[in-house]
Structures are given as structure tokens and as C-alpha cells.
Amino acid sequence: MNRRTFIQGLSLLPLSGLAVAAPQAAKKKSATLKVSLNAYSFNKLLNDAIRGRGEGVTLMQLLDFCARNKFDGFDATGYFMPGYPAVPPDSYIDGLRKKAADLGIGISGTGVRNNFTTADAAVRQEGVNHIKQYVEVAARLGAPVIRVFADTQMRAENWESVSKGATRAQVQDWIATNLRECAEHAAKFKVKIGVQNHGDFLKTGQELLTLIKAVGSPWCGPIVDTGYFKTPDPYVDIALVAPTSVNWQVKQSPLGEDSEVPTDLPKLLRIVRNSGYTGYLPIETLSPRGKPYDPYAVVPAFLKELRDAIAQTA
């Protein structure tokens, strides 16, 4: 049974069935986990290069960093590509893919910004069109997943404020309708739409699964952000969503970027293995507000911790 068939099968099961199906798959595929770097770990330096604020770093240069640190994959996030939100030239996409291939690095995914919680239907449709464009970028890159959001993505706003009094059910219908249109397009290019929980509209694992069920497409599934479930025990939410996950964002803390409580990586890896997930585990380190942050030091250290946990749970 391949990964696609497994996911499609899970979509037909009630949640109670996941507990039976997932461990069986885990026994067969427990060793096939690969580590990837999410480009956002270098957010400031990437934006420095884009805006001409000193030397910074580019996605191309981060591929060299990945090779030096023996990452298996790289999430080439769209908003660090030249000219974003415009689509980059084919020559750039092809060059990025070729360099990754030459270095033996897989492209584990990409991602874009969107807002499907706004009451402005025109803005939502712009987001749909934008995602469709970058689905084609993902396909050209060889990325299996494009990361999108069901959350507002604005620090000063939330889904309740931008939806202008709409109910949660109404907003979920907006999001599901938009994601369904994106998934229909993505299916043509064999790219999955990955929906990441980001602590606003999607605070819990059940909220994420409910949305994915409302979309109702095998080409749309959850991305588990291990640091953005706003619940008393995020590991419960992670375990709930893990069996149907299409990708991950492994964070340093389950309690958000400003927390000093570290992720229990062996516990997390046991959840991953029990879920039957196989594929990339991208890490995303974040810069805590008001504190020094050097991704060239932080990323390799966290990578080692993740690799140790993978080995420990094999």
C-alpha cells in the first residue's frame, strides 16, 4: 500500500478507526522518516537579502547549508522567492530544483500566504488564485505539498475581527469552499494542499480535522505544526491529527515561539511512528522576541536533537 492509498483509505474511516489502522502501518514503515529544513528558520536573513539590507541569505544558499548539515530535504517557502507574491521565472524554479538534485536534497514542500477568514470575498478569491499559481510552482519544483493557512496571518487581527461578525460555521464554510477549489486544481498536478494549524481559527486538533473533513478532498490534508495547538496538552492534538498528516512543522517548543519549554522529541517521534506517517519531518526554528537568535547555530543543534530522537525510536 502506498502513502496516497493509505491517506485516501483513512479519509473513509471514522476517527475511532485511526487507532487501529495507524499502528499497523507504523510497523511496516517505521524507518522511513527524513529530516528537512523549513526556510522560515532563516526568516530575517532571507528578508534581508530580498530587501537589500546587508548580505542576508537566499534560498539557493540555504541549499548549500542543507548539504553541509546533511538534511534530506528543504522546504523552499514561496514568499522567499524573487518577486513574491508574483510567480518566479521558470528559470529560477528550474535552477532551484537542479541545485537541490545536484546536492542530493529533496524538495519537501513550499508555502504561500493567504487569508480565507476575511469577510471580503474578493480577497479570498485572490488567495485561491494565488495558491493555484503556486501549486504549479510546487509541481515544477517537485514539491509534493504546498502549505496554506486557515488562519488570519495578521498579528493585530484574528478571524473574528476580519470576518466582520460572521459565525464560526460561516467562516469554516468560506475556508472549506476555497480550499476545495484549490485542491481540485492541485489534483491535476499531483500536489497536496497542506493546511497548517496556526493558533487562530485552528487552535485544536479537532478543529483542524473538522475543517479537512468539510473540504472532503483526498488532495487536501493537515500539516501538523507542533508548536501551534493552543490547548492544555498539545501532544494530544498532535496525536489526533498525525494519522492523516501530509507534512509537519517540528518546533522547538509545543507552547509557542516565546516558550522555553522544550519539545519532548522522543515523545513526539513515538506519536509520529505510531501514526504511520512516512516522509519528511521539516524543522522550523523561530526567533524569540527580544532575544538573540543565530539560525546557523540553533538549526544544527535542533537538527541533532531530532535525529537523536528518530534513532532512539527506530
Label each region the model flagged.
Residues 2-145, 166-173, 180, 217, ...:
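N-terminal pre-domain/capping segments
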Residues 172, 176-271:
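Acidic/histidine-rich catalytic cores of soluble enzymes
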Residues 33-38, 74-76, 107-112, 146-148, ...:
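Hydrophobic faces of well-ordered beta-strands that scaffold small-molecule active sites
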Residues 78-91, 115-119, 154-157, 198-205, ...:
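Acidic-and-aromatic substrate-binding clefts and catalytic sites of carbohydrate-active enzymes
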Residues 138-161, 189-198:
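Active-site groove signature of glycoside hydrolases
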Residues 28, 103-104, 185-191, 214-219, ...:
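Short helix-capping segments at alpha-helix termini
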Residues 47, 277-290:
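Short helix/strand-capping connector loops at secondary-structure junctions
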Residues 49-50, 158-160, 208, 235, ...:
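Short aromatic-enriched loop/helix-cap "lid" or pocket-rim segments at secondary-structure transitions
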